[in-house]
Amino acid sequence: MKSDISTRSDGTTSRRRFLAAGVGTLGLGTFGGCLSSVRGDGRDPVKFGMVAPLSGSLERIGTHCKRAVEQAVADVNDAGGVLDRPVELVVVDSGASAETAVSEYESMRGEGVVGFVGGLVSDVSIALAPKAAEDGLMEVSPASTSPSLTGAGVNGDRTFFGRTIPSDLLQSVVMAKALDDPRYVDADRVSLVYIDNAYGSGLAEALHENLSASVAADVAYDPSADDFAPVVEEAFADDPDAVGFVSASGQEKGVLDAYDASDYEAPWVFSTGMLSGDLPSYYEGFYSASLSSVRTNGYLTLTKKLSELDPIAPYAVNGYDALMLMAAAAEHAGEAAGPAIADSIRAVSGGTGHTFSVGEFDRARALLDAGRDVNYQGAASGVDLNADLEPLSPYVVERVTDGGVEQLELIQKGYFGGDGQ
């Protein structure tokens, strides 16, 4: 008799088909106890969480990301849910504070979530990763880029932290290229101005390692300060050729307004995510190391679904991808539990399997039911996760020219070495 247990090309066994075979052979009465522990009774919801800044300076990013994650939940439920169970979303407000996030995480965990999207801010993800690993919950961040998160969230032989946004190690290489390259800024001496948190300090440290230019000043700043003139004065005290600026949309304005009000003049190179909307005239000639904004089919489908968010905030589409990967991983594993999701999330993110994308969770379920490999093609990118459960992504060197953003050079992900699965 031909076995119903199938082995995929990634070496994993299709547990969903194994369960079906067990029920057919043994009968529901014999196998019912085991079945309910894995698949539920068809009514109990699978709960995923979200930790996001829904108030404060990052409120727009947090609320847009929440809306995208809600859309992912709706798409999964429209396809029949995870393992025939509806998905529910438990959302808590981190307020962009690690202390608040830890408190709200405990509340969310008490609701019975098996994994969560978040944090957005690197400080929050750094605080939550060890807790999630200890509790056996899968955490997938759509926006935390600190290099210190590579290898975070490990418990035994499992990694419980992943992200759908690449590490700042990649961004630092592109910022350094824009500052050093004779085709761009061609600076000999650079001042680094960075937001005073794990994201800012981590990217600044990586810039030190990748710059050929000497660093004239390191200036950390508090985005909630009342006066930013001292930040600009310190940055220009030793007459640098350029400024490398590490910040985030919504937290950069104070420093840049202070620069505009000063008599200093030099090109700036921005970290990603700050060249959007109406650009001030003094941005002319500024550069950015930006994530490549390739409009994938998944991106176009999702932004059409989220047409009320125009323009959509950075990282929102990454939030959609985070939820979809966890849902697909649970479906692949045949079990809606954190350890099972951690074991399967890389397998559904890349490789040579059959592709599915935004709004196609029904296709993923059908393929997995048939014992096939799947490969999620996300809204943000292909999202092929490496062994540290983070993607490599292409970047673009951009420059503000005549009030618009000009793309100067595409840096393919192969430039950074390595690969996803």
Placement of each model-derived feature along the sequence:
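Extracytosolic ligand-binding ectodomains
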Residues: 2-26, 31-421
